[in-house]
């Protein structure tokens, strides 16, 4: 555990200890249970902000009559706490009014729904999001929403988290989530920067119920995952802490079709802390701190033949078993967010400052990589970022609500690369012993955006949300700006039917951490030389996006919806893994298009909760016009004049699940669930009968994975429960490929996880 992690952990534990000592009684940060489908139906046209997570009845804000006798300590504590809960509820509601997702398509998941998913709140965040419509699974925990590569924006309590270098691990823990929403489609003007989807998390806060949870999950792959969460409040102070440790032998997807990969251990440390202080009835400040440190072994593929020079001889003489390769990667992500929120009558605003440090270090097998590849690259990237965000809403009258805001993010990337190569002669053959080439450099990027929009209630059943935003991107490799109009219309012809349609123009800068920084010509005359030396700078993507959909409640508890979208882009951004390092590189397609349709449905009745999603999608691009040195000449020539599928395109993606809850068994309740994921497969290269290779012309075979589980809560004391849970992931042990090692920016085969048994034992108090 390095010094940065140790200091962050120590400071957060000290903060918790001090606050606990000051608190009269701790409070757990869970919201009241309610039966709901694992993925809620879209709330695209919900023009009213959701109710606060735990707003107390209005009566709680009035002072009770003076008691005839002195109150007990317990009743006095309740009388003190209820007004504070009401204040928090009003402030949460005000924050929701600042940043509503008017006209966009939003899928919500709450704490109860998390429990109804495989592994519950121990599930990785990417597995949670895979249950939403149109989300395709990729290797390394990657997600593709509506046919786009990454381009996801994460927010906590409405504040953006600056991007980091998160490649294999899942930085955010589902345990601190009170609720979350994935918002896609034609986004309102407040959303810029990353626009394929907005993952907005509302954290647990420690204001609702007393207690916490401590437990451990054990299971297949040598999994040992202890965890603890604890929340509390005392008057105006509220706090929450979540910490976990994870060790297993399935850190990265297996490159072979076996139960357990070779050399695939991971250790992960995660910490999240939340602190809030109510200044008065209309304002509060809050601080969030997160720290994650993750170590990964890179899994080996046994039986690989040695890499060869053009003359057929191996790069190095002798024998080396690929079973014994020792590549590793270390990742670290820390961030802090400080926010001030204020309500002044019809004016609501929130101002936040944030900072982040992120790093990824790939360490090669210095001998083995030379033997198999002729190249061994040690790559260390460190990204520091900071910025401010301000958002406000003002209700002019019953017909108009204005919203506006700004965001500025400044990033600095340090890249330290040492590449060990062989010298080669004019014929491309080894001509001497290996030697290192150092390439250390810095790059910088500044992103700034501002927006203004109006929510116009044209009629009782019609709302138009229109506005625009202006974005600027200045970096060491590119300088651009754009004005982006946005408009969404919501029509509710009946209480059970909602129709929405919208248009958005997007401006998406390239992720600084993925922009290639190494010089091309410094490798001329070596085993790492590229046959192409053209290296045009990576540019920002500009796109136009239209979206329309309808939702309908057919019967009490039964609802469904359909949503269609089309995007056409200039300088469409993509990225991939090139060479042997596992740090991605970004590039542009001159033109791109993505389109599709999503079908959703859910049914709730008593303890039964079900959902089903099916998404159809196509994503294509033409002509790579940046970072051309990443590709081989044949690929570059083909794509220059031909549209190809993007490597992350999956034509059909589906998910479905059902759960049932018996509330009174053993005083705590029993829950059982089953769900399934299906995909037609990500893209792979196609080889025609004539021997021509078409980039991304084929796809890996279609696949499915089914999961089942059961959870039992046993009441041992008032508000104290023992929880026992069994999850069986991929219950039929289906072996399926995520990648086969071919395709643009794909450098290795990867398989989905095989059957796993996981047992969780926890104590809620």
Roles of regions detected by a PLM:
Residues 26, 32-117, 150, 343:
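Short, acidic, small-residue-rich periplasmic hinge/interaction motif at the N-terminus
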Residues 59, 248, 262-264, 282-342, ...:
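Flexible loop and strand-edge segments within Gram-negative outer membrane beta-barrel domains
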Residues 75, 125-128, 143-144, 167-168, ...:
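N-terminal periplasmic accessory domains that precede
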Residues 159-185:
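Short acidic/polar hinge/loop motifs at secondary-structure boundaries
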Residues 220-247, 258-299, 328-348, 396-397, ...:
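Transmembrane beta-barrel wall of Gram-negative outer-membrane proteins
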Residues 251, 677-687, 712-765:
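C-terminal beta-signal and adjacent terminal beta-strands/loops
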Residues 343, 348-364, 492, 536-606, ...:
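Membrane-embedded beta-barrel scaffold of Gram-negative outer-membrane proteins
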Residues 561-568, 585-685, 762:
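Gram-negative outer-membrane beta-barrel transporters
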């Amino acid at each position: 555990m390095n010094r940065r992690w140790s200091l962050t952990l120590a400071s957060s534990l000290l903060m918790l200890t001090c606050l606990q000592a000051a608190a009269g009684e701790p409070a757990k940060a869970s919201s009241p249970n309610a039966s709901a489908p694992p993925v809620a139906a879209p709330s695209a046209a919900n023009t009213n902000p959701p109710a606060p997570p735990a707003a107390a009845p209005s009566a709680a804000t009035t002072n009770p009559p003076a008691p005839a006798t002195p109150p007990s300590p317990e009743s006095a504590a309740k009388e003190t706490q209820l007004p504070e809960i009401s204040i928090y509820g009003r402030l949460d509601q005000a924050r929701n009014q600042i940043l509503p997702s008017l006209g966009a398509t939003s899928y919500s998941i709450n704490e109860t729904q998390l429990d109804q998913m495989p592994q519950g709140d121990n599930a990785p965040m990417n597995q949670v999001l895979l249950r939403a419509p149109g989300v395709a699974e990729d290797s390394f925990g990657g997600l593709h929403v509506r046919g786009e590569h990454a381009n996801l924006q994460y927010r906590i309590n409405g504040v953006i988290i600056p991007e980091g270098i998160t490649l294999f691990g899942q930085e955010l823990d589902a345990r601190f989530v009170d609720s979350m929403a994935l918002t896609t489609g034609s986004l309102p003007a407040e959303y810029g920067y990353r626009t394929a989807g907005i993952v907005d998390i509302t954290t647990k806060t420690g204001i609702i119920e007393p207690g916490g949870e401590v437990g451990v999950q054990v299971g297949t792959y040598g999994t040992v995952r202890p965890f603890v969460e604890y929340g509390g409040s005392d008057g105006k102070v509220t706090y929450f802490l979540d910490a976990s440790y994870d060790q297993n032998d399935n850190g990265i997807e297996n490159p072979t079709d076996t139960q357990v990969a070779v050399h695939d251990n991971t250790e992960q440390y995660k910490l999240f802390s939340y602190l809030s202080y109510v200044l008065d009835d209309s304002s509060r400040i809050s601080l969030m701190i997160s720290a994650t440190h993750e170590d990964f072994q890179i899994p080996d593929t046994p039986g690989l033949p040695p890499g060869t020079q053009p003359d057929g001889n191996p790069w190095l003489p002798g024998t080396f078993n690929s079973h014994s390769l020792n590549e590793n990667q270390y990742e670290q992500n820390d961030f802090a967010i400080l926010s001030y929120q204020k309500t002044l009558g019809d004016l609501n605003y929130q101002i936040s400052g944030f900072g982040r440090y992120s790093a990824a270090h790939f360490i090669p097998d210095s001998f083995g990589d030379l033997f198999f590849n002729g190249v061994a690259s040690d790559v260390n990237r460190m990204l520091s970022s900071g910025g401010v965000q301000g958002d406000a809403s003002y209700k002019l009258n019953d017909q108009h609500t204005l919203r506006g805001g700004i965001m500025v993010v400044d990033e600095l990337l340090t890249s330290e690369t040492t590449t060990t190569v062989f010298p080669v002669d004019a014929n491309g053959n080894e001509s001497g012993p290996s030697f290192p080439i150092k390439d250390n450099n810095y790059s910088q990027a500044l992103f700034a955006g501002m927006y203004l929009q109006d929510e116009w209630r044209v009629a009782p059943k019609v709302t138009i949300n229109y506005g625009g935003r202006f974005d600027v991107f200045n970096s060491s490799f590119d300088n651009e700006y754009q004005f982006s109009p946005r408009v969404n219309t919501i029509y509710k012809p009946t209480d059970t039917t909602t129709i929405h349609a919208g248009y958005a123009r997007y401006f998406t800068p390239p992720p600084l951490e993925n922009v290639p920084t190494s010089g091309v010509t410094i490798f001329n005359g070596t085993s790492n030389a590229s046959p192409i030396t053209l290296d045009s700078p990576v540019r920002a993507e500009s796109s136009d996006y239209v979206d329309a959909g309808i939702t309908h409640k057919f019967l009490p508890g039964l609802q469904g919806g359909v949503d269609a979208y089309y995007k056409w882009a200039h300088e469409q951004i993509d990225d991939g893994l090139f060479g042997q390092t596992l740090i991605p590189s970004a590039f542009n397609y001159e033109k791109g298009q993505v389109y599709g349709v999503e079908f959703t449905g859910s049914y709730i009745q008593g303890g039964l909760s079900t959902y089903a999603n099916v998404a159809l999608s196509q994503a294509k691009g033409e002509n790579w016009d940046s970072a051309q040195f990443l590709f081989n000449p044949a690929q570059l020539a083909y794509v220059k004049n031909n549209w190809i599928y993007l490597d992350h395109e999956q034509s059909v993606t589906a998910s479905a699940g059902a759960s049932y809850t018996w509330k009174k068994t053993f005083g705590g309740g029993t829950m059982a669930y089953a769900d399934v994921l299906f995909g037609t497969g990500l893209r792979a290269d196609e080889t025609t009968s004539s021997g021509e290779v078409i980039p991304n012309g084929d796809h890996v075979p279609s696949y499915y994975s089914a999961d089942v589980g059961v959870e039992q809560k046993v009441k041992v004391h008032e508000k104290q429960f023992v929880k026992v849970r069994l999850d069986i992931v991929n219950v039929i042990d289906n072996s399926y490929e995520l990648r086969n090692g071919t395709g643009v920016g794909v450098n290795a085969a990867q398989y989905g996880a095989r059957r796993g048994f996981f047992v969780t034992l926890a104590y809620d108090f």
